[in-house]
Each structure stands twice: as structure tokens, then as C-alpha cells.
A protein has these predicted regions:
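Conserved acidic catalytic loop of the alpha/beta-hydrolase fold
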Residues: 2-18
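Short, hydrophobic alpha-helix immediately C-terminal to the catalytic nucleophile
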Residues: 8, 33-37, 178
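Flexible "cap/lid" loop of the alpha/beta hydrolase fold
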Residues: 47-91, 95, 130
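Short beta-strand/loop motif that positions the catalytic acidic residue
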Residues: 115-117
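Conserved loop-alpha-helix segment in the C-terminal half of the alpha/beta-hydrolase fold
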Residues: 123, 127-165
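Catalytic active-site module of serine/aspartate enzymes centered on a nucleophile-bearing elbow/loop
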Residues: 155-218
């Protein structure tokens, strides 16, 4: 994926020394994951926020996967960013096969990893043609399972089910993303702080949500 090489070139050109803790949301999580496999010596911690998962395709299976790709192609909109009108967009699933090949040959090395997953269901069109026949009851457990599988990529990864957030967890509950990043950075600097964690993202005096929640039935 070209954007991974571009990010690497940008960090080098900007003289930002590694190694890095990467944080990525949605497709940005895919970029972070592929960066870590492409440049394994440069990444020592990651936070993936409701990220595109390498497990989506096998979990959705041969019947559902093409429907998911078509659904996202029809529903995705690109919001222009001032000054970046010519920026390229990444078609959904365009790098999936390459990603799974890369991650299979270059697994994620052990590191502090925090995985955040949305809890509020996506708003699906009521028109079955537009939704590709998906319902929240069908799709949400699969998305949850794909997110949860990311927390099994390395030993001692932390998983958090953000029940009060939609896909944009960093906007709906920004403190969760901030705390996850803080915990990963602290874990890189002092590994004992990571292994001693009893929860991801929540501070010691705030346990209103259960970090080990099983989420939707699946």
C-alpha cells in the first residue's frame, strides 16, 4: 500500500526519529498495522481505534464479504479537507489481500497494543438494496469479532468495548483514545506498567464500563 511507504518517507523527511507508537482509526488502523509489518523495527507500540481488521474477510466469509464491500462502496462519502482537495482516497478493501499476505509473512512482534471497538451500532439503510441485506443484528457481532481478534495478535494486548461510542470513538469518547495512547506510551517506557494494567483506557478511578465485556453474542 503506497500510503505506508509515504508515511515512512514523511517521517524520514521530517526528521522524526523512531521507534514509534502508532495510533490509527478505521483505515488509519490498517495503515498502522501494515506499517508495523513493513518496518517492524520502527514500531514499538500501537493503538487501533475501531480499525479495519485483517480478520474481516475470513470472519464475514465468502457470501457476506462481497456484500460488505459493495455496501461500503455505495455508502462511503469523502469529506473534503481544506488544502487537500486532490488527496487520494482509499477504496474499501482495496488493500485487503495485500494486507493479509503481508501480515501473514511478517506477524506483529510483541509490543503494547490497545484495541478499541465501537459499541453503538452503525446506522444501516432500511432499504435492503442499499444495505446489501445486512441488519444490525447480523453485522454487529461480526464486526465485534473482527475487532476482538486484533487483540490476539500479541500477548498481553488490551481490548476495550466502547459501548457509548459509534465508529468515531475518538470523537464520541475522546478520553478513551487519549488514555489508551497514554497507557501504551507508558508501557513502552516502563513495561511493568503495561503488564500490571487491569483495564484498558479507563483511569484507576473510573470503571464505569467493563473492559472485558463480551459484546454482542456471536
Amino acid at each position: 500500500m503506497a500510503i505506508v511507504a509515504e508515511l515512512h518517507a514523511l517521517l524520514q523527511a521530517a526528521d522524526v526519529p523512531g521507534p514509534y507508537v502508532l495510533a490509527g482509526h478505521s483505515i488509519g488502523g490498517l495503515v498502522s498495522r501494515m506499517y508495523a509489518s513493513t518496518y517492524p523495527d520502527e514500531v514499538i507500540g500501537m493503538v487501533v481505534i475501531d480499525a479495519y481488521s485483517e480478520f474481516l474477510k475470513p470472519i464475514f466469509g465468502p457470501e457476506r464479504w462481497p456484500r460488505l464491500v459493495k455496501f461500503n462502496a455505495a455508502s462511503s462519502t469523502v469529506v473534503p479537507i481544506p488544502g487537500y482537495g486532490d488527496a487520494e482516497t482509499i477504496p474499501y478493501a482495496s488493500g485487503d489481500d495485500h494486507m493479509r499476505q503481508l501480515t501473514a509473512t511478517s506477524p506483529l512482534r510483541p509490543m503494547p497494543l490497545a484495541v478499541l471497538a465501537h459499541g453503538r451500532p452503525f446506522d444501516l439503510p432500511k432499504d435492503p438494496v442499499l444495505s446489501q441485506g445486512f441488519t444490525s443484528k447480523e453485522i454487529e457481532p461480526l464486526l465485534f469479532k473482527a475487532n476482538k481478534a486484533q487483540a490476539e495478535l500479541v500477548p498481553d494486548a488490551r481490548f476495550f468495548h466502547a459501548k457509548e461510542s459509534g465508529h468515531d470513538i475518538h470523537q464520541d469518547q475522546p478520553a478513551l483514545s487519549v488514555e489508551a495512547i497514554r497507557q501504551v506510551v507508558a508501557g513502552v517506557r516502563s513495561p511493568d506498567t503495561w503488564y500490571e494494567l487491569t483495564s484498558c483506557c479507563k483511569t484507576d478511578d473510573d470503571h464505569r464500563a467493563d473492559p472485558n465485556a463480551a459484546g454482542p453474542d456471536h
